[in-house]
């Protein structure tokens, strides 16, 4: 039970102990720290009770291994899950502070970047809320991927120093440190006791992995699970002898080598050193996490052969899949198991989630790099590969084409997805269409050989962050109309459908949307200096920047609309605000050029008085969870326009839907299931189907030049990329122009079918405008999107993982 007076005293005490100040003298940032420590005090009681329950009930634990955890701010989320948000807000008001302002002092933890990391965060929230024992396992990046600045329209990457003031919601746990080894060589000697060879790793560089634990609170159930992120430190901190001899570089050499591992998420791998660092990162957190999990298991259990009965490792994409070989190494070299015993334990303990259809994103490592950096692990993968090839040969005698396609080591590379599929007891896709494409296209040979492993788990999102916290006005309205059960049972939202023809309810629903649009318009004015009209259609595309996600199609259409208004100033046109938010990987030149184009178009369009503000273009800098929450709540239209067959699932589409924004999209990823739930009449679908795209890719027959030569308006749009309309440098966007029309090297012209879908997209946008003019009709669409979003909760996804893959039991936490 939350005690307000005790909480106020705790905040004052924290200010005194942490800063030697009275509360009146404290800065906003210091108040944030003090409030967070007071909240953590409450959480720690639950955390201890949860650990006690796990010790007593000995449940099976899932270790969710992910390169990214895009958590978002913790203070507000924890208060929501503790059901203490209102009381803390009130307590702080009595102390003279505004909780919203305090929340704004918290940096977004820079532990992830895109949908992969946000999914992992939603899953942790659902696991805790559903009373399942789980650990998240990742890396404590010091600077994240980067903080995005926009200068002269270009993305500039600066370090995201989120830890500079310390982070109150983490606990350093040096007593659980592990050693991780890189490089060296493997010595083989005969072991007379076992009657076989013993493999001894020597001459390695050792790094200390230090765990930092972050609490993951369940909603209103006293459960607190753990996200364990690993920091790297040298075994020997500081070489005083070298320092005294004047060799200052050598004195800190080991520290620098260790620190490099955890400095940034996804270091640029356009060069060899970057590739090596990425592999180091992956092995570092996987090895430390496996060592910790096995140590925890052995505290209560003597028989390592039964590890899989109490532990399961879920590998989130290919980044952690080195876990297969590392688990084998630990079981054989440290626990003394033979190959067959270790293989049985491993193949019952590891499961793999595939997150991409893009074959270039399925990680492959050069043999030379892998074998040099991880010599013993590479030996094990060689043996797994040898045995796997024998299994393929046994099933498909003489079919060398199969071996070529399925081998784990082939053509000088180690193929991590193949390793995960060969060893994992489960392989899942993340939307129904995605899983079907994996089974019938990308991983067809594996599916034919072992169909029992493959299953689908459509992604989901946590409504506690993306509605209850992100959109409190709508959350309160929903609770008034159908009660609070939707917070832990999202399909309850279906009850809202009865209000789809209730004019009063529809008006209230749209009034809330308008207030959220006003809030976002204020943010845009403060951060971008652009005045946008909240009465305009807020058309939003926020997501990682990649060519297949087709931000380029969106901005080319904006240019097309701009041309239409310029040529026909008298035409009826409903004002639009096109909102973009996206980070491009530091080494991804094309994606960065698209950001520049969006900003160059914005500069021209926003400053052209002749169009009378009918179009505004806004690029929101440094898109992240905390500003995403405002954006989802305010959007009218959800742009989900990836090339069909390329987006595995998407979860932004679900967040927009939950907040009452109809989808404008292709039949790709989870869009297919969204349309099934809400009805095609409440979405705006366009473009080639996935079958049509795959057919063109496999058989040819698409030439964008035909469209360019026959469609004058499309030709005009493309010519404006290179004729000085948006830059005095006519060569600036030449590469984007060329990518749409000219085949280069192995890349087809317009490989993401932007021109093929352009007219269909423009027509869908016209349908959006016509629908929006019908206020009641639009309100009904918006309300029904919220009402039909119940399927897309991560609670449902996690329950499916539990039922079909992990087989966990619920844990009941009872505080004293």
Where are these regions (language model features)?
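A conserved ligand/cofactor-binding region detector
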Residues: 1-816
């Amino acid at each position: 039970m939350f005690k307000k007076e005790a909480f106020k005293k705790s905040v004052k005490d924290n200010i005194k102990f942490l800063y030697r100040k009275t509360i009146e003298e404290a800065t906003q940032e210091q108040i944030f720290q003090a409030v967070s420590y007071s909240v953590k005090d409450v959480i720690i009681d639950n955390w201890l009770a949860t650990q006690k329950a796990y010790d007593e009930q000995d449940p099976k634990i899932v270790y969710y291994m992910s390169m990214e955890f895009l958590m978002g701010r913790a203070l507000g989320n924890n208060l929501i899950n503790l059901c203490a948000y209102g009381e803390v807000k009130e307590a702080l008001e009595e102390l003279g502070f505004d909780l919203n302002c305090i929340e704004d002092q918290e940096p977004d933890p820079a532990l992830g970047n895109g949908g992969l990391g946000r999914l992992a965060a939603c899953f942790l929230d659902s696991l805790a809320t559903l009373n399942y024992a789980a650990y998240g396992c990742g890396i404590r990046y010091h600077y994240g991927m980067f903080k995005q600045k926009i200068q002269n329209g270009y993305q500039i990457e600066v370090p995201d120093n989120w830890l500079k003031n310390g982070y109150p919601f983490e606990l350093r746990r040096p007593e659980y440190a592990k050693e991780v080894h890189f490089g060296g060589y493997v010595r083989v000697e005969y072991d007379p006791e076992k009657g076989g060879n013993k493999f001894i790793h020597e001459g390695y560089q050792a790094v200390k992995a230090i765990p930092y634990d972050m609490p993951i609170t369940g909603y209103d159930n006293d459960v607190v699970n753990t996200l364990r992120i690993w920091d790297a430190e040298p075994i020997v901190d500081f070489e005083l002898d070298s320092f005294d001899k004047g060799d200052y570089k050598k004195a800190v050499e080991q520290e620098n080598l260790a620190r490099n591992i955890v400095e940034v998420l996804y270091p640029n791998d356009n060069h060899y050193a970057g590739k090596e660092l990425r592999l180091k990162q992956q092995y570092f957190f996987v090895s430390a996490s496996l060592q910790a999990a096995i140590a925890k298991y052995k505290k209560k259990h003597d028989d390592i052969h039964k590890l899989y009965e109490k532990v399961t490792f879920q590998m989130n994409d290919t980044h952690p899949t080195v876990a297969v070989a590392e688990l084998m190494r630990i079981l054989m070299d440290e626990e003394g198991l033979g190959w067959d015993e270790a293989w049985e334990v491993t193949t019952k303990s590891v499961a793999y989630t595939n997150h991409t259809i893009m074959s270039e994103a399925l990680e492959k490592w050069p043999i030379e790099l892998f074998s040099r950096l991880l010599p013993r692990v590479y030996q094990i993968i060689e043996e797994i590969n040898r045995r796997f090839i024998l299994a393929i040969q046994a099933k498909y005698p003489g079919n060398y084409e199969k071996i070529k396609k399925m081998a784990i080591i082939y053509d000088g590379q180690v193929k991590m997805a193949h390793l995960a599929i060969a060893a994992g007891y489960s392989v899942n896709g993340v939307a129904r269409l995605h899983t079907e494409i994996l089974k019938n296209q990308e991983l067809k040979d594996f599916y034919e050989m072992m169909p029992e492993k493959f299953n689908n788990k459509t992604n989901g999102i946590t409504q506690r962050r993306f509605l209850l916290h992100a959109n409190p006005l709508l959350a309160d309205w929903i609770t008034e109309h159908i009660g609070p059960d939707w917070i832990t049972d999202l399909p309850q939202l279906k009850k809202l459908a009865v209000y789809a023809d209730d004019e009063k309810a529809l008006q209230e629903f749209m009034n809330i949307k308008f207030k959220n649009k006003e809030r976002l318009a204020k943010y845009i004015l403060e951060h971008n200096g652009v005045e946008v009209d909240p009465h305009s259609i807020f058309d939003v595309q926020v997501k990682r920047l990649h060519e297949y996600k087709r931000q380029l199609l969106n901005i080319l259409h904006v240019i097309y609309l701009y041309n239409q208004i310029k040529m026909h100033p008298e035409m009826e046109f409903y004002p639009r605000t096109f909102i973009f938010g996206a980070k491009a990987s530091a080494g991804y030149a094309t994606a960065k050029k698209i950001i520049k184009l969006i900003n160059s178009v914005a500069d021209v369009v926003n400053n052209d008085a002749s169009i009378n503000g009918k179009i505004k273009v806004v690029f929101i800098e440094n898109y992240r969870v905390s500003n995403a929450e405002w954006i989802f709540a305010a959007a009218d239209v959800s742009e989900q326009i990836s090339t069909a067959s390329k987006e595995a699932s998407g979860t932004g589409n679900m967040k927009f839907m939950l907040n009452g924004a109809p989808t404008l999209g292709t039949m790709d990823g989870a869009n297919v299931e969204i349309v099934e739930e809400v009805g095609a009449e409440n979405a705006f679908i366009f473009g080639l189907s996935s079958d049509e795209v795959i057919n063109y890719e496999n058989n040819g027959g698409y030439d964008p030049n035909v469209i360019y030569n026959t469609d004058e308006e499309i030709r005009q749009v493309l010519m404006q990329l290179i004729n000085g309309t948006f830059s005095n440098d006519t060569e600036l966007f030449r590469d984007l122009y060329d990518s749409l029309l000219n085949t280069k090297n192995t890349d087809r012209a317009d490989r993401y079918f932007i021109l093929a879908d352009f007219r269909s997209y423009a027509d869908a946008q016209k349908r959006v405008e016509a629908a929006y003019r019908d206020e009641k009709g639009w309100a009904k669409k918006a309300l029904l999107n919220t009402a039909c979003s119940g399927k897309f909760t991560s609670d449902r996804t996690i329950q499916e993982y539990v039922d079909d893959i992990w087989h966990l039991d619920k844990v009941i936490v009872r505080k004293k």
